[in-house]
């Protein structure tokens, strides 16, 4: 006898990689995004952040694993999500604080930092309802964030 849910998933197992379809549907409705872009898992954002940093440390995001580099830095918009900061601290990643402007991080500062510091590999950002302020990044801020080097991570 198979135990199935509405979606014909065997619910006796661990579930799908992207999370429960019903949770993803709710997330899509709340965030006004397509379900295909929504992940729903245990404390998903924190889990994803930790997994990504671990992958970059051991596999890299460009030419070499980050753990082979002398210094790894990530830009941290402030005020920001304390879990971003805790992950960086735990993994020995240098945090560079950049103030929020009302449209996201001050991109003039970000661009200057990235241009002059090869150790910077990315930026923590939550462009929609940024924690803890609720700030929403402007289209210009998002576009400017996407222009950096191949090993830049957002």
Each model region followed by its residue ranges:
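Conserved core of the PLP fold type I
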Residues: 3, 7-153
């Amino acid at each position: 006898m198979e135990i199935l849910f509405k979606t014909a998933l065997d619910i006796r197992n661990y579930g799908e990689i992207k999370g429960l379809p019903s949770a993803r549907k709710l997330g899509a409705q709340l965030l006004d995004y397509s379900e295909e872009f929504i992940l729903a898992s245990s404390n998903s954002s924190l889990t994803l952040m930790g997994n990504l940093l671990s992958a970059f440390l051991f596999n890299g995001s460009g030419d070499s694993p980050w753990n082979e580099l002398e210094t790894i830095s990530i830009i941290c918009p402030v005020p920001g999500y304390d879990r971003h900061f805790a992950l960086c601290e735990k993994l020995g990643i240098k945090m560079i604080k950049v103030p929020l402007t009302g449209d996201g991080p001050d991109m003039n500062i970000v661009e200057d930092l990235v241009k002059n510091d090869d150790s910077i590999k990315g930026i923590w950002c939550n462009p929609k309802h940024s924690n803890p302020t609720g700030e929403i990044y402007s289209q210009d801020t998002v576009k400017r964030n996407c222009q950096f080097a191949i090993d830049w991570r957002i």
